[in-house]
Amino acid sequence: MANIAESAVLVSSASSAQAVAKLTQVRGPTSGFDKAQHIIGSYSTMGFQATNYGLARSIAQRMIRKQPPSKVYQIKDGKYVLVPPDVGEDGKTLQQEHVYPNLFMGVTANLMGTGCREAVRFLVQEGVVHRSLEASAPASADGTDDQLMFARLKREYVETYGGPPHPDEEIPRAHSFLCAIVVSGGGVEHDLRRACTAYTLHHYASEAQGHVSSTVSSEATAPPKGLQQRAEKPLGTRAAAGTAKPARFGNVEYPRQGSTGSELFDCLMRTFVQRLCARQARLRAAAMAKPIPDKYDDVCSWSVTPSEVWALCGLWLVDMLAEALGAVRSCTSRLTSGSAVGTAESVTANGKGPEADRDAHIATSASYRAEALARARTTVVYWAALQQVSLFSPSFVDGDITSYLLPTPAPAARPAHRKGGPVADENAGNSKELKRSRKASSSSSTSATAVKVKPPVVERLQVDLVRDVYSINKLAMLSKKTGMLICGGGVVKHHVCNANLMRNGADFTIILSNGQEFDGSDAGAKPEEALSWGKVRMEGAFVKVYGEVSTYLPLLLAEVFVPAVRQRRATDDAQPRRKRSSRGARPPQDVSGHSHLCRGE
């Protein structure tokens, strides 16, 4: 017994001591406290979420480098077995071609209303993989669905409008960092609205009115005068037109639909919706004119997917903004000069009205094209169309576009006399003065709202969500290496992870979220749970940074992606005639001459 106890207690700990010695010691910076980059560079050894961020930074750096493709597994006798690499005729293992991973990004809609929108736009606009600028061939039939979609939409644009969709823009010299973006409903609408009007910073609803950051002026945080006056009015009084309370999420506010400040966005969205419905009517008529096929096809050929909707928006954006700017400015000028009578009926959502007004809008839209281009270049959807990056939106109907697609209900008629309400004055003079005052207040409210656009009559839009699910799943399955950058949670996280499940998981995963796993929701789940589902590969690198996305995403951008772009540009300047690389070992070509499937040389 003594020998048994001695052998159980007196165990050699040499191996454990060696393992402990290899662990990273916790330490922070001891100098250079005036250099932010030095402080952030030491996050990896500081502990807690600083260490997780340091790991996310290292994973992001690996995401944008060339490396061997993912390992391939197959099920044999109920177990996953690693498929050995191909062997040549001489019996030697063939060298695998290194590729750049395809990066899938998930972004929740609220982030597009913050400064994270500019970070997402940078990731779409810039990249490190050079684009082939040689003469291009048409898209091949074995290309990915997004390649074929953009090629088809560009041909359709040329046939409809007689020119290329982006005549004012040069083709980017590099492919986008991203191959696909998944955004929740309302995200693209935030992107478009911010190109039309400014979002402002205010205090949180749970905070006192004066409790704001020192970076936000007190004037910006104070509610508008119209809101102050309305708050002073007794309950039940009617607010003046154009003083609708701004929409708010967190400490960010923006003009509500139909209110002052939202005229350009409203006109833009109505123009967009009318174009979508007109296009669908053309496609439907063309489909009905074709003979009935022998083989039944259960895919509606004239329907539209959410990714197709936002691709069309990116292709049409400059034209629509120029048209909307012309309509809004001309209507505003007529209101200012006092020569407008019935402006709500004379200007429709897409500038169509009386023939004279229509010709005037067409003539003036060209003069607004420079401003429209400048506004469009600030958006994610514009650069996504230019870089041929699909914007998937599985919760499409949650966005603001639905309110422009559905018919607007007419307001209920107000009764002349209500029980307990004011009694009509029998004095005719007082009645005339009352009418005069109402007319004056109506005139002032009309000038305050600047533009009242008559909602167009639109048909129902046939939307197909299943085709988008198939497209993103196919894109992940054909990718030789993938990474996931998920900002937030919910439907965008599930959609990106589920697509990578179809290829036995992503190789690199970064999740930025403050969601917790304790309620069992997908939004707060850790990467380890995704590993159990097969959404993250067994040999993959993954990390979850617990924190608010607007804190960590700009840091990740500044430390990883911006330096990579600077290095690529420096290389381009030093070697202007350097041979450009294209994506993929077997690259299907699109109309711009580059492959989009997998990046490699």
Curated annotation (Swiss-Prot):
Catalytic activity annotation: [eIF5A protein]-L-lysine + spermidine = [eIF5A protein]-deoxyhypusine + propane-1,3-diamine
Summary of activators and inhibitors of this protein: N1-guanyl-1,7-diaminoheptane has a small inhibitory effect on activity.
EC number(s) per entry: 2.5.1.46
Biased composition (Low complexity): 440-451
Family in the record: Belongs to the deoxyhypusine synthase family.
Subunit structure: Homodimer.
Provenance organism: Leishmania donovani
Name under which the protein is recorded: Deoxyhypusine synthase
Polar residues compositional bias, start-end: 211-220
Phylogenetic placement of the source organism: Eukaryota, Discoba, Euglenozoa, Kinetoplastea, Metakinetoplastina
InterPro entries in the record: Deoxyhypusine_synthase, Deoxyhypusine_synthase_sf, DHS-like_NAD/FAD-binding_dom
Region (Disordered): 210-242, 411-451, 568-601
PANTHER family recorded: DEOXYHYPUSINE SYNTHASE
One Gene Ontology molecular-function label: deoxyhypusine synthase activity
Membrane-spanning residues: none
Metabolic or biological pathway: Protein modification; eIF5A hypusination
Active site: 535
